[in-house]
């Protein structure tokens, strides 16, 4: 199924922070692209080889909280474990009492010589300017990270 999303993701200007807009024909694809956008802020995800897989599961009552926990968990994965994920990410989103993401990220241990460094260090996820909406036939996830 194709849709008319403008891109997988894009960045916007924001004082001392970075605004990210991730797009997807489905919510799952938008959450995947939000993860790739986060990675590409610090290193070059296209250089990552799928040598290992990490499972990530997060849940929350609403989609905004789920997005916050998703990005926050990915920041922890990179900061604490030095795991660099590439663009091969499987995301399953379920709705019940709340929302739950079960994901598998394929990647390898971060190596600055291989994966590079863009010059940005993402410090934290914020709720500032967060927005999740459906536009025509695609989803937009907007979030701001502190750098």
UniProtKB/Swiss-Prot annotation:
It comes from the Archaea. InterPro entries: Archease, Archease_arc, Archease_dom, Archease_dom_sf. GO terms for molecular function: calcium ion binding. Ca(2+) binds at residues 17, 146-147. GO terms for biological process: tRNA splicing, via endonucleolytic cleavage and ligation. Activates the tRNA-splicing ligase complex by facilitating the enzymatic turnover of catalytic subunit RtcB. Acts by promoting the guanylylation of RtcB, a key intermediate step in tRNA ligation. Can also alter the NTP specificity of RtcB such that ATP, dGTP or ITP is used efficiently. PANTHER family: ARCHEASE (PTHR12682), PROTEIN ARCHEASE (PTHR12682:SF11). HAMAP family: Archease_arch. This is Protein archease. It comes from Pyrobaculum calidifontis (strain DSM 21063 / JCM 11548 / VA1).
């Amino acid at each position: 199924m194709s849709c008319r999303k403008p891109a997988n993701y894009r960045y916007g200007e924001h004082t001392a922070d970075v605004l990210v807009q991730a797009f997807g024909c489905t919510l799952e694809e938008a959450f995947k692209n939000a993860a790739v956008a986060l990675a590409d802020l610090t290193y070059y995800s296209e250089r990552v080889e799928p040598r290992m897989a990490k499972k990530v599961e997060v849940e929350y009552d609403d989609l905004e909280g789920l997005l916050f926990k998703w990005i926050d968990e990915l920041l922890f994965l990179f900061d604490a474990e030095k795991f660099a994920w590439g663009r091969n990410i499987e995301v399953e989103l379920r709705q019940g009492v709340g929302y739950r993401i079960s994901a598998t990220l394929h990647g390898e241990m971060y190596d600055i010589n291989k994966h590079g460094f863009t010059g940005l260090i993402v410090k934290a996820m914020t709720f500032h300017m967060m927005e999740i909406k459906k536009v025509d036939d695609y989803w937009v996830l907007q979030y701001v990270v502190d750098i």
